[in-house]
């Protein structure tokens, strides 16, 4: 069974209108030729093809949120329960590239990156993946963006002071405006301080910090928001150097308070476990904003809407052909 997608419907309609309104032979000939050219450009999607399933690695907070929300908790950390020959993406950007280049692929990405991804975002339980629908509670596939920070800076007192200032900056009107611009979902209540109103609490902000490097990392889904925030804050705090190395949510705690000790600020696209494996110190972590997760397919795919049950059946290997899920 094959579904045909008409990528240039408006153009075809315009040609038909032109042909009906202009009786000249030359115009009619041109219209017919153009119509034939449009027909040759029809994109065909074969639903009898096997679904190519993509996932993130077990270090990913997006994978954690995605699998948990669709009721497939056992797949958060265990690849053995997933469909055979599943492919793994190294990050949010890598997932986007894989789906863009695989006509029969399916995966999941951060809503904050959907608009510029070139992928098709699917409805979830009948609801479009939009910021408005996350805010009104109708779109259920979402999670928080969070941060955690180092608590022992040793002799790096300048870094520690900059990190403390950065955490306070996150609650300002300026920072929240930036997060919203980066598609983070949150409200500005009007009660937030401005940076100017709290800057005097952080003397480090008036110093020349151009030779001080602060290390940021963690979630690849939060990377865009994190980079925008540090780019904004650096000139407000002595032009410190922000070094970003994002390898997944699992590295956020490990890098700041765990065994790796290679980050000063870590970002997560899930909640901290707050167990023995992620025993973050009270007051050293918090929420940035909300972000949704979107199931995505290639633009030529005729699949438009999905459900938790359908996604789970694809990722578990119960359904392997596109015809199994496309009516």
Give the location of each predicted region:
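Positively charged n-region of N-terminal signal peptides that target proteins for export
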Residues: 1-5
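Hydrophobic helical h-region of N-terminal Sec-dependent signal peptides
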Residues: 6, 10-15
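Terminal disorder- and signal-encoded targeting elements
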Residues: 11, 21-22
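C-terminal motif of bacterial Sec signal peptides marking the signal peptidase cleavage site
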Residues: 16-20
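Flexible loop/hinge segments at secondary-structure junctions
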Residues: 22, 26-327
């Amino acid at each position: 069974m094959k579904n045909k997608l008409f990528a240039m419907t408006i153009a075809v309609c315009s040609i038909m209108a032109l042909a009906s309104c202009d009786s000249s032979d030359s115009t009619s000939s041109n219209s017919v030729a153009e119509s034939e050219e449009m027909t040759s450009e029809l994109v065909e999607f074969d639903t009898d093809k096997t679904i190519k399933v993509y996932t993130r690695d077990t270090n990913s907070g997006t994978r954690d949120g995605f699998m948990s929300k669709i009721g497939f908790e056992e797949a958060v950390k265990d690849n053995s329960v997933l469909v055979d020959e599943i492919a793994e993406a190294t990050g949010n950007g890598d997932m986007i590239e894989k789906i863009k280049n695989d006509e029969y692929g399916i995966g999941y990405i951060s809503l904050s990156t959907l608009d510029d991804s070139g992928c098709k975002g699917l409805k979830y339980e009948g609801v479009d993946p939009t910021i408005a629908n996350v805010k009104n509670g109708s779109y259920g596939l979402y999670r928080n963006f969070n941060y955690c920070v180092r608590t022992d800076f040793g002799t790096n007192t300048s870094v520690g002071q900059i990190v403390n200032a950065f955490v306070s900056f996150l609650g300002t009107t300026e920072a929240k405006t930036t997060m919203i611009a980066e598609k983070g979902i949150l409200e500005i209540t009007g009660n937030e301080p401005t940076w100017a109103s709290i800057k005097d609490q952080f003397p480090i902000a008036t110093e020349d910090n151009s030779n001080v490097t602060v290390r940021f990392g963690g979630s690849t889904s939060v990377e865009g928001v994190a980079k925008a925030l540090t780019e904004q804050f650096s000139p407000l705090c002595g032009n410190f150097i922000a070094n970003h190395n994002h390898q997944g949510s699992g590295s956020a705690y490990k890098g700041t308070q765990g065994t790796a000790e290679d980050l000063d600020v870590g970002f997560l696209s899930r909640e901290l476990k707050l167990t023995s494996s992620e025993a973050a110190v009270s007051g050293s972590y918090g929420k940035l904003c909300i972000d949704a997760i979107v199931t995505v397919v290639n633009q030529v795919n005729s699949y438009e809407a999905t459900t938790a049950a359908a996604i789970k059946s694809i990722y578990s290997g119960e359904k392997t052909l596109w015809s199994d899920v496309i009516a």
